[in-house]
């Protein structure tokens, strides 16, 4: 059985419209949270052409899943603003947030149509998973080159109460497992931590696609400090617990535990 995970609340903060276009204001906003993080809007979706009403609600740009054309535009002004904000901050202390493919496709199309495609357009959906996987890896490489040390990858809809266990298992098989293998290959050239939302983590663990390896500390450490020091795949708890301290956590190891 795949466990559910109750998200840890991270209350939204009021944001001035100018913050979306002003690197200095964006950097100040990024520093004011529980941990320093960018972007303040889903940058992958923005670079794929999505607009956000009032900085919150995505305006889908496709009617049918077959119409989706995944062309990343790194000349997008939102991306350039984020990079400038990152330069103001310390990249080595900034978490880069990435939303998973279901969230991105929701922005591009609308979630109800994506869920319909899970049943009727599986091949089209899997092709989009493959393309998004490559887009994510390319984006991660760009951020690593700028000195980023921690990434947070979330897929908030990945809950058996919403999608059902069968669809979550398909998501893991068709996207997540292979994507994470690509991420881990980057460790050959870079040192960084890749943090998964626990919803993804427990899907992997409960489907026997991964296992935990415990790390203990002599004294409790803030979770955010652990993430910046471990250089590994992690995610046994929500990143919104960044300011909480723990004396032990778990790394995630892909594959079966044969020990």
What are these regions (language model features)?
Residues 1-58, 168-195, 200-259:
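N-terminal basic, low-complexity leaders that serve as flexible interaction/assembly modules and, when applicable
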Residues 18-19, 41-77, 150-168:
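Glycine-rich, proline-tolerant flexible connector loops at the mouths of alpha/beta enzymes
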Residues 34-38, 86-91, 141-147, 184-188:
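Acidic (Asp/Glu)-rich catalytic clusters
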Residues 53-142:
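Active-site-proximal, glycine-rich beta->alpha crossover segments in alpha/beta enzymes
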Residues 76, 138, 158, 258-259:
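Metal- and O2-centered redox machinery and metal/ROS homeostasis
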Residues 94, 151, 191-193:
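Hydrophobic/aromatic residues located in beta-strands of well-ordered beta-sheets
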Residues 131, 152, 180-181:
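Non-heme di-metal
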């Amino acid at each position: 059985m795949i466990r559910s995970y109750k998200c840890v609340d991270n209350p939204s903060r009021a944001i001035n419209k100018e913050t979306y276009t002003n690197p200095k204001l964006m950097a100040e906003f990024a520093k004011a949270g529980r941990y320093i993080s960018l972007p303040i809007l889903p940058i992958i979706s923005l670079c794929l052409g999505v607009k956000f009403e009032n900085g919150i609600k995505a305006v889908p740009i496709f009617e049918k899943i077959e119409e989706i054309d995944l062309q990343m535009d790194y000349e997008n002004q939102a991306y350039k603003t984020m990079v400038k904000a990152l330069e103001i901050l310390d990249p080595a202390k900034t978490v880069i947030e990435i939303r998973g493919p279901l969230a991105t496709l929701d922005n591009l199309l609308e979630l109800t149509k994506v869920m319909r495609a899970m049943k009727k357009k599986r091949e089209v959906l899997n092709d989009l998973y493959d393309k998004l996987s490559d887009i994510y890896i390319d984006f991660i490489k760009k951020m690593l080159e700028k000195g980023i040390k921690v990434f947070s990858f979330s897929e908030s809809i990945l809950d058996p109460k919403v999608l059902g266990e069968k669809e979550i298992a398909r998501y893991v098989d068709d996207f997540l497992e292979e994507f994470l293998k690509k991420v881990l290959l980057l460790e050959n050239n870079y040192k960084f931590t890749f943090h998964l939302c626990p919803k993804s983590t427990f899907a992997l663990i409960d489907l026997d696609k991964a296992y935990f390896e415990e790390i203990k500390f002599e004294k409790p450490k803030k979770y955010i400090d652990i993430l910046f020091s471990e250089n590994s795949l992690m995610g046994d708890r929500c990143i919104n617990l960044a300011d909480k301290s723990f004396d032990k956590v778990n790394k995630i190891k892909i594959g079966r535990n044969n020990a």
